[in-house]
Amino acid sequence: MGDLARLPLLEKAPTTHAGLLAWVEEVAELTQPDRIHWVDGTEEEYTRLTGELVEAGTLTRLNPELFPNSFAAFSDPADVARVEEQTFICSENQRDAGFTNNWMAPAEMKQKLRGLFAGSMRGRTMYVIPFVMGHLDAEDPKFGVEITDSAYVVASMRIMANIGTEVLDKITATNAFFVPALHSLGAPLAPGQADVAWPCNPDKWIVHFPEERSIWSFGSGYGGNALLGKKCYALRIASVMARDEGWLAEHMLILKLTSPEKKSYYMSAAFPSACGKTNLALLDPTIEGWEVETLGDDITWMRIGKEGELRATNPEAGLFGVAPGTGWGTNPNAMRAIAKGHSIFTNVALTDDGGVWWEGMTEETPAHLTDWQGNSWTPDSDKPAAHPNSRFCTPISQIDMLAEEYYSPEGVELSAILFGGRRKTTVPLVTQARSWTNGIFMGSTLSSETTAAAAGQVGVLRRDPMAMLPFIGYDAGDYLKHWISVSGKANPERLPHIFLVNWFRRTADGDFAWPGFGDNARVLKWAIERIEGKADAIETPIGFVPAGHALDLTGLDLTHAHVEDAVRVDREEWDAELASIEEWYAKFGDSLPEALRAELDALKERMADHS
């Protein structure tokens, strides 16, 4: 083992998995850590690591009376979000990465990365984190091992995934395949050099090698760049595995809706960021007798079941939510889960009594805070107290409304799939697709107007197919073909119905056309009644929308005319929309599925007859 005589922990490795041992040895030789620690996932280990992080200044321990066993971290201001421009899909063939991804030849990228990782863990501990996405006792568990030099990553991964000794034992016992996920902060320490609270490197690379199912992440300690089980594995690499193995890995929530008659239905829903995905996952219905429970708020893996049905599971163990806008008024269920503690907050503000705060958390703004950069803050300050992309990392088990089916390895049968964007005009409140392929067309053209939070021009349309634009691990046209192909593998009678929703439509005078939040349960109720063949709908060129009387408006100060306005299909608006879709589809070139081109042509014909 040559240079590894100084790494005695490798000799005492708690596994005999030859492939894993060889990889750990290779990484240790490359990165030169001072020591290796195999993560066991225990509470004792978590307590020790978080204690060390508090001593190092990386974590601040919160007031245990307010947030038990919870911590706040504050990142380098240059390390606050996913770095899409430095995220690469290095497929062997450039065509397989497609127009939505950055690409570099794998050999060239590996050479670059080896140069960056050489000696990158000097002076640090190398942590080996065995993890499984989803259930350890699933029929086909999806394993990963993350190597990192960040104890903050270890602590966060303990919340977000199933990690530790039990997972490693199963990887070893079954000689299982695992996704190797290598992460380094890129901040080696020379002997005697003082560390900083948030080590990182200005040169950041988040790289995926789809054919070999591997991930290399360098330079960032933040969220989706560093917790490699999340977007990197569960979406980018898993979407490629799903294509090859006949399933789907999607950026979706899963909810359970139970009617007054105690009949339950399961839905998944895809929304781009800032469109209310977590709020819908944790919905409090405003209609009597209907109940919502959640199975997940961000990632859904879907497989075809034994009877041709589409079954969904959530591969994650935690919530990694955007904090600003999550509040007692808008999402009390999320707040109740967070209030139980056992959470790590990143780039939020601190209250004077040792709690946390962010914009939108409470109606009243505290008179004084310490902002995410450590400055004294008052409501007169000209900058937000919490970073707009600040996060809470909380165990999903703390959600009171967590459905028991979350724990089932078989998952749940989906009755409906929702796609939703943020549009002031054009797109109705809710539209039922005519068919599976028509629903894929809706998903493929999903769009949102950019908000002030996004860089660039406000109000510009951003197409985001299935809300997966930053996460598709291969060519986007092939991805849409794969979605269409599911109908050929499934029982057509058991396929979920697809709906397009838009909670953000405005009236002519600029008000929201629909109250949203808990009242969105009324739209879900209509969708279920459509599936059951009970609710009335009006056929439009784009699909079926509710008849004015078909939405349950009990207790709302709305009329059937309001509903008719919220679902109106305007010919002029759609002429502009069709031109915009043409531009979008042109970007796919010859990888656009013929079936979607046919859907667009058919929609144009129907629209031509629409007054």
From Swiss-Prot:
The keyword Nucleotide-binding applies. Substrate binds at residues 82, 222-224, 273, 389-391. The keyword Manganese applies. GO terms for biological process: cellular response to glucose stimulus; gluconeogenesis; glycerol biosynthetic process from pyruvate; oxaloacetate metabolic process; propionate catabolic process; response to lipid; response to starvation. It catalyses: oxaloacetate + GTP = phosphoenolpyruvate + GDP + CO2. GTP binds at residues 274-279, 391, 422, 517-520. It is found in: Cytoplasm. Keywords: Cytoplasm, Decarboxylase, Gluconeogenesis, GTP-binding, Lyase, Manganese, Metal-binding, Nucleotide-binding. Binds 1 Mn(2+) ion per subunit. GO terms for molecular function: GTP binding; manganese ion binding; phosphoenolpyruvate carboxykinase (GTP) activity. Belongs to the phosphoenolpyruvate carboxykinase [GTP] family. Monomer. PANTHER family: PHOSPHOENOLPYRUVATE CARBOXYKINASE (PTHR11561), PHOSPHOENOLPYRUVATE CARBOXYKINASE [GTP]-RELATED (PTHR11561:SF0). Catalyzes the conversion of oxaloacetate (OAA) to phosphoenolpyruvate (PEP), the rate-limiting step in the metabolic pathway that produces glucose from lactate and other precursors derived from the citric acid cycle. NCBIfam families: PRK04210.1 (NF003253). This is Phosphoenolpyruvate carboxykinase [GTP]. It comes from Arthrobacter sp. (strain FB24). The lineage of its organism: Bacteria, Bacillati, Actinomycetota, Actinomycetes, Micrococcales.
